[in-house]
Amino acid sequence: MSRTVNCIKLGREAEGLDFPPLPGELGKRVYESVSKEAWQGWLRYQTMLINENRLSLADARARQYLASQLDAYFFGQGADAPAGYTPPQN
């Protein structure tokens, strides 16, 4: 049986993550309040940030930047949009 969480991003009950995706307090907060669906959205957004900003995950500053963006994406006012990014028109 899967666990459910009141997803902070989706604003509704949804299937929760199977385990904390990160170590530490931030990983615990994500595990307790983010659904699998919202986490997949973050992974897509994180990939865009890495590619558009040409981040190297070997760089500690890049990892710190992504952690701050993750916090903003779920618990703040939203993550940064890459420079020049225009969301697709539906």
Swiss-Prot record:
NCBIfam families: PRK05408.1
Keyword set, alphabetical order: Iron
Function: Could be a mediator in iron transactions between iron acquisition and iron-requiring processes, such as synthesis and/or repair of Fe-S clusters in biosynthetic enzymes.
A family per Pfam: Iron_traffic
Gene Ontology biological process terms in this record: cellular response to oxidative stress
Superkingdom per UniProt: Bacteria
Classification via InterPro entries: Fe_traffick_prot_YggX (IPR007457), Fe_traffick_prot_YggX_sf (IPR036766)
Listed name of the protein: Probable Fe(2+)-trafficking protein
Gene Ontology MF term list: iron ion binding
Gene3D superfamilies: Fe(II) trafficking protein YggX
An example Gene Ontology CC term for this record: cytosol
Family the UniProt entry places it in: Belongs to the Fe(2+)-trafficking protein family.
